[in-house]
């Protein structure tokens, strides 16, 4: 899977980005995602994610992670239509993850675990959203959170 990383904070160590990439590659293998799949991960601060949260979700407050799944159509969006031949030539693009490193650090302290664990959790959580999982209904939440724990535990990133 091809993952593009953008660090708007210019503070995320290269080793941490590599670790998140390894975790997301592991999660992609776990879900049997095709190798020619693409996605992006952007690291921002609370002000940056608050602006995105306000503009796209109508919530004027910072949050930890936002996922923009390209395969999900919004209510007022028209579908992008390709014929099968065109579609076969294009890599699958899951979409974009935006993670607030500030919020991740705050939550790591709140939950009593490492920043590495919190960043990994948020990356996998957002990755599952990009792949169609959600937690709006109790049964969906159970499935998504169970899968999230399974991936993190199998990778070795436990609480």
UniProtKB/Swiss-Prot annotation:
Q: Which residues bind Zn(2+)?
A: 125, 129, 135
**Where's it mainly located?**
cytoplasm
Designated name of the protein? Endoribonuclease YbeY
State the needed cofactors, names only.
Answer: Zn(2+)
Q: Which UniProt keywords apply?
A: Cytoplasm, Endonuclease, Hydrolase, Metal-binding, Nuclease, Ribosome biogenesis, rRNA processing, Zinc
Task: Copy out the cofactor comment.
Answer: Binds 1 zinc ion.
- What family does this chain come from, according to its entry? Belongs to the endoribonuclease YbeY family.
One Pfam entry name: YbeY
Q: Which organism is it from?
A: Enterococcus faecalis (strain ATCC 700802 / V583)
Q: Where in the cell is it found?
A: Cytoplasm
| Enzyme Commission number | 3.1.-.-
């Amino acid at each position: 899977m091809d993952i593009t990383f953008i660090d708007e904070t210019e503070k995320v160590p290269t080793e941490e980005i590599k670790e998140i990439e390894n975790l997301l590659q592991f999660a992609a293998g776990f879900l049997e995602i095709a190798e020619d799949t693409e996605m992006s991960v952007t690291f921002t601060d609370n002000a940056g994610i608050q602006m995105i949260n306000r503009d796209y979700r109508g919530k004027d407050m910072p949050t930890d992670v936002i996922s923009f799944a390209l395969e999900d159509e919004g209510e007022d969006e028209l579908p992008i239509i390709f014929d099968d031949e065109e579609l076969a030539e294009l890599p699958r693009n899951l979409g974009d993850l935006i993670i607030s490193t500030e919020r991740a650090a705050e939550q790591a302290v709140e939950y009593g675990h490492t920043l590495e664990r919190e960043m990994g959790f948020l990356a996998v959580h957002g990755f599952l959203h990009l792949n169609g999982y959600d937690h709006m209904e109790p049964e969906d939440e159970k499935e998504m959170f169970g899968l999230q724990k399974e991936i993190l535990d199998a990778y070795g990133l436990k609480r």
